[in-house]
């Protein structure tokens, strides 16, 4: 609408991806944020368990999802679709133990203190019905469903790291080395999700939209994330 009124788009447009958030457009609520705001299965990638790319290979130190979310988004954006893989033992723990038990970072522990995902298994079934989660008795079935051609080999290698207590690939903290060994096996498909777009309509210092000649468009003001000024110099 602003462009139709004669305003120009600034040159600092981008997407804010500096933190990770689970998301899938197939889900009835597409984005995971605060507790009780989405299907809890969407949170599976942020508990330090195994994450794989679209071919079934690891691509990140999964502990970053728990403790260093500012570092987690770039690999996720690069990979696109990614999958959290868990076994029955891990899922049962998530459904019965406080979420804070899965985090080593004190800030995260405080944020989720006392919260238990007691409806996780039922919500996972709902996610499977929507098409963004899948459960099977074997890893091979999970791999076939999502086309994760390297998943079985990846899990075999990963379980070796869990047994030894040393991640030789991404050097994840041993506290997050939970094996994927006991069926049934669970997979949750996620896609990148950003907070907002950065940049937009070019404005002057008074927030007035500018036209192609940098003259103010009468009566048109732009603020916040819709304005180019928000990105540069303030963001």
Protein language model features and the residues they cover:
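Residues forming the flavin
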Residues: 1-235
